[in-house]
UniProtKB/Swiss-Prot annotation:
InterPro entries cross-referenced by the UniProt entry: Bifun_inhib/LTP/seed_sf, Bifunc_inhib/LTP/seed_store, Napin/2SS/CON
Subunit structure and binding partners: The mature protein consists of a small and a large chain linked by disulfide bonds.
UniProt family annotation: Belongs to the 2S seed storage albumins family.
Pfam families named in the record: Tryp_alpha_amyl (PF00234)
Protein name listed in UniProt: Napin
GO MF entry, a single one: nutrient reservoir activity
Tissues expressing the protein: Cotyledons and the axis.
Species name: Brassica napus
Signal sequence region: 1-21
Length: 180
């Protein structure tokens, strides 16, 4: 009887350790500096070509810039800085009232290969970030907030645009300072 009890408790302890070990996963993202990485955000050469042929996702860059420069809570279709996806989920034909610039951006993203959506969005985000730095000459916390809004918007664009096989782009802004 004691052997059976020991065997059962040892088995339970083993499964507990196995389950506990699988819960804690560490995800390491390496975001190389574009100055030292000639590929930049494009680790897949095909994506670089698509980004260049799509004229650098011009509508998406304009949309990202517009969203980043808005202060306060943002447009009516966002909630506390996060996109409100309920309208997209309830209406299978997509949102009824998408702003025209966002619709153009979504059209650009739909023309991309699913594998290239995130790399091309990252390239567009970096272009907008550079544009903001040059135009605004902002420093410190204000610049960090604008750049954070650029990447937050770009991260969720695939879901907003209903891009097949891509829901979010898990990239982070590349600048010194705390990561959000």
């Amino acid at each position: 009887m004691a052997n059976k009890l020991f065997l059962v408790s040892a088995t339970l302890a083993f499964f507990f350790l196995l389950t506990n070990a699988s819960i804690y996963r560490t995800i390491v993202e390496v975001d190389e500096d574009d100055a030292t990485n000639p590929a930049g955000p494009f680790r897949i050469p095909k994506c670089r070509k698509e980004f260049q042929q799509a004229q650098h996702l011009k509508a998406c860059q304009q949309w990202l810039h517009k969203q980043a420069m808005q202060s306060g809570s943002g447009p009516s279709w966002t909630l506390d800085g996060e996109f409100d996806f309920e309208d997209d989920m309830e209406n299978p034909q997509g949102p009824q009232q998408r702003p025209p610039l966002l619709q153009q951006c979504c059209n650009e993203l739909h023309q991309e290969e699913p594998l290239c959506v995130c790399p091309t969005l990252k390239g567009a985000s970096k272009a907008v970030k550079q544009q903001v730095r040059q135009q605004q000459g902002q420093q410190g916390q204000q610049l960090q907030q604008v750049i954070s809004r650029i990447y937050q918007t770009a991260t969720h664009l695939p879901k907003v645009c209903n891009i097949p096989q891509v829901s979010v782009c898990p990239f982070q802004k590349t600048m010194p300072g705390p990561s959000y």
